[in-house]
């Protein structure tokens, strides 16, 4: 039954998990926002989901998704080559900063660099080639309100927007084409995974971001019934583990409780 349970149908155990999450994020103003969404039913729990914060490298995810969807339409050539010049040198994350200038890379390679090692130079090269405004128009049609709005290659994000683009990634992946599988492989190949699933499983597709105190992650968790989890924070790299580990644990438990209850409700309907 592809129908979420109503608030009245939730049991006390699930309500306790929800209160635990709310209490966790109320502990500090640096615990900025989160959103959990069960992909199959749309059941959602959130905190501060519409408030905006600096994107850091999370913005590379909707950029990559946009480019692959445009490639599917024949509007982007993933084999086109762009030249890495000194103008794009960036001391932040990535691999191009260790490469020679005036070398050519395909759009496909640059997208992979932007997602897996989170290459800032690759991101800026792609943004300059394809344009923030085009990405803004694409995503606002899908319901986002913050990403790509500012005249910057970075900008702001909120938890709801991050959920929208990760759900788009999941839906695109389910078209099961060569391109959609290639794109998803970039996200599953990311080695840095602040958010996790049941028993600390790292079976996720994610894109995190860190800049100064801003520290975020947006992940598809490949549970038996997959879900999306987004956490946005100002905790910084040195202090993220408590918030992200505990949120992952409580959400995975809540998700399991939710599906156990849903299964039991369905059985009651079937058996009368």
Regions flagged by a language model, labelled:
Residues 71-108, 124:
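Active-site-proximal loop and beta-strand segments within enzyme catalytic domains
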Residues 42, 53-84, 114, 229:
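Active-site SXXK
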Residues 65-73, 116, 164-171, 252-256:
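Short glycine/serine- and small hydrophobic-enriched flexible loop segments
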Residues 37-39, 87, 115-118, 126-129, ...:
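Active-site-proximal beta-strand/loop segments in catalytic clefts of secreted hydrolases
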Residues 1-28, 44, 52, 170-191, ...:
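Structured C-terminal helix/loop/strand segments within mature extracytoplasmic catalytic/sensor domains
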Residues 5-17, 99-182, 186:
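Active-site-adjacent helix/loop patches that line small-molecule binding or acyl-intermediate pockets
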Residues 33-36, 56, 113, 122, ...:
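Structural recognition of the beta-strand scaffold that forms the well-ordered cores
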Residues 30-52:
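Short, conserved catalytic-motif segment at the N-terminal edge
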